[in-house]
Amino acid sequence: MHFRNFNYSFSSLIACVANSDIFSESETRAKFESLFRTYDKDITFQYFKSFKRVRINFSNPFSAANARLQLHKTEFLGKEMKLYFAQTLHIGSSHLAPPNPDKQFLISPPASPPVGWKQVEDATPVINYDLLYAISKLGPGEKYELHAATDTTPSVVVHVCESDQEKEEEEEMERMKRPKPKIIQTRRPEYTPIHLS
């Protein structure tokens, strides 16, 4: 992100106004402006209706500070009005800055990894050697009890299935024993051309 520098403009105040009549009625607006004209004659107002804010620009910072001291958190038409010094935002460039390249290498890897990057080693797989030992002792159709049953737990028994290769060989033998199906040709329908009839 680009560097932002907030500076306060001590010759401008922002008034947070709860009463929306200021933005639509000229009499209310004149009353509001008269509050601040007592502190400075060369004053300008900018009304921001959607934000319910008014920017008040004074000719010097002393009159702005005096107005804030006297009018901050005072009531205007029955509602509290708050005054703050306006902030001006100075950005180093008028263009948007690119985002920080924190973890972008994961999205599209560069030619070389960033400094300090270490490859994470995959954890070794969990191998149950008891199960492998039991399977190695068994033949097809036999079973092996890994854990005997107790009052609270069931027993764990391994059944070894027949291999797929043996099944495939049996199916192939059955196919060879079956007679080949006879394909009966479909007879062609009778056709007489229209121009001959």
From Swiss-Prot:
| Coiled-coil boundaries | none
Checking CDD domains in the record gives: RRM_RCAN1
Q: Could you state what the record's PTM comment says about this protein?
A: Phosphorylation increases its ability to inhibit calcineurin and decreases protein half-life.
Q: Which GO terms describe its cellular component?
A: cytoplasm; nucleus
Matching entries from Pfam families are given as: Calcipressin (PF04847)
- Segment Disordered: which positions? 163-197
| Modified residues annotated as Phosphoserine in this record | 108, 112, 163
> Which keywords does this Swiss-Prot/TrEMBL entry list?
Phosphoprotein
Q: Where is the sequence biased in composition, kind Acidic residues? A: 163-173
Q: Which GO terms describe its biological process?
A: calcium-mediated signaling; negative regulation of calcineurin-NFAT signaling cascade
Gene3D superfamilies documented for this protein: 3.30.70.330
One MF term in the entry's GO annotations? calcium-dependent protein serine/threonine phosphatase regulator activity
* Similarity remark: Belongs to the RCAN family.
**Assembly with partners or alone:** Interacts with RAF1, PPP3R1 and PPP3CA.
Cited function:
Inhibits calcineurin-dependent transcriptional responses by binding to the catalytic domain of calcineurin A. Could play a role during central nervous system development.
Q: Supply the name of the protein.
A: Calcipressin-1
Originating organism? Pongo abelii
